[in-house]
Structure formats: structure tokens, C-alpha cells
């Protein structure tokens, strides 16, 4: 459904009387994309057809965002899009400007190593959002997952060229 498209976040309840919707993400690359922009909108409901929609405005609001789309002018019209997931074409992603920046999608597949460069035989398979901090999900085998808080105390250097992620002192917290 979304080959070549990046999931941005989920639409929340209508906001105000002019058809705006809440956009449930903490930080959005959409603030760096030239508007208006054509996005895909999908839902997990198989009866909901994937739709293209034009984003006209995005504004910060209470630590999140609100968005306005072409053709949606009332709360009633906005209501049918609640729960929809927005997708942006990959080719519109803003360029990475520093070596410390990355897109979360680029981390999937990294191999875990310890501080000494020894492979832990863990592969990063997912990153879960969490109110306190993201959680890195590593797979050691088909049945075993290891969850690690994405914090400097546990995670060292990310090397996208070598496809590695350094985990700090895994022997101390792996037993928990």
C-alpha cells in the first residue's frame, strides 16, 4: 500500500469549527516540507479506501500539531478522517543536515554491538513510541525480543554506514 511512502502519524479528533484535525505526533517533518503537499491517507479498516489528500497547513498546538486539508471545511467533514494515517512520499523528506541526525526508519536492521565492537547477534526490528522515550526492539531469535530504552545511558554510537548500533554495558541490564 505504501511502497515509497513514509508513515508520519495518525489523525485525531476534529479541532475547531473550520475542519482542522489534531495530528498525533510529537515532532513532524511536515513543518519542513513546502506546502501544499499531496499525501496519502489510509486506515487499518479494510473498508476504507486509500485516498490522496492535499495538506494546506500545519500548526503546533499544545506540544502536538493541528492540520488543515483541501476540501475539509467543517468538523463534520473532518470526523470521517479520524484515525487515518498520513503518508509522505520518501522523495519529499528533508535532507539530513548533520551526522547526528537520522530518520527512525533508517535504524531498522542495525546490528547491535557492545562498546568493544563485539557483535551481540541482535537486530533492531522496531522502535516503539513511549511517552518517556522511544523503546528499541531487538530480535535475538524468532521468539526472543529485547527492549531497550533509547537513552544515552544505554545507547552509544549509531553508524548507518556500518549498520551498527552500540549498546552500553548490555551485560548489566540484559538480565533484568
Curated annotation (Swiss-Prot):
Main location per the UniProt record: cytoplasm
Gene: rimM
PRC barrel domain boundaries: 99-174
Protein name: Ribosome maturation factor RimM
UniProt subcellular location: Cytoplasm
Entry note about domains: The PRC barrel domain binds ribosomal protein uS19.
Function description: An accessory protein needed during the final step in the assembly of 30S ribosomal subunit, possibly for assembly of the head region. Essential for efficient processing of 16S rRNA. May be needed both before and after RbfA during the maturation of 16S rRNA. It has affinity for free ribosomal 30S subunits but not for 70S ribosomes.
Protein family membership: Belongs to the RimM family.
UniProt xrefs under InterPro entries: PRC_barrel-like_sf, PRC_RimM, RimM, RimM_N, RimM_N_sf, Transl_B-barrel_sf
Subunit structure: Binds ribosomal protein uS19.
A cellular component annotation (GO) from this entry: ribosome
BP GO terms, sorted: ribosomal small subunit biogenesis; rRNA processing
Amino acid at each position: 500500500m505504501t511502497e515509497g511512502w513514509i508513515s508520519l502519524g495518525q489523525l485525531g479528533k476534529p479541532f475547531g469549527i473550520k475542519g482542522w484535525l489534531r495530528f498525533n505526533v510529537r515532532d513532524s517533518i511536515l513543518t519542513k516540507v513546502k506546502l501544499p503537499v499531496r499525501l496519502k491517507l489510509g486506515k487499518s479498516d479494510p473498508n476504507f479506501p486509500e485516498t490522496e489528500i492535499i495538506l494546506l497547513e500545519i500548526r503546533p498546538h499544545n506540544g502536538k500539531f493541528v492540520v488543515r486539508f483541501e476540501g475539509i471545511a467543517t468538523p463534520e467533514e473532518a470526523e470521517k478522517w479520524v484515525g487515518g494515517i498520513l503518508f509522505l512520499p520518501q522523495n519529499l523528506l528533508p535532507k539530513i543536515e548533520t551526522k547526528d541526525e537520522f530518520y527512525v526508519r533508517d535504524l531498522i536492521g542495525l546490528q547491535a554491538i557492545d562498546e568493544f565492537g563485539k557483535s551481540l547477534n541482535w537486530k533492531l526490528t522496531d522502535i516503539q513510541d513511549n511517552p518517556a522515550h522511544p523503546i528499541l526492539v531487538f530480535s535475538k531469535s524468532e521468539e526472543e525480543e529485547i527492549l531497550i530504552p533509547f537513552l544515552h545511558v544505554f545507547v552509544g554510537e549509531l553508524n548507518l554506514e556500518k549498520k551498527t548500533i552500540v549498546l552500553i554495558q548490555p551485560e548489566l541490564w540484559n538480565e533484568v
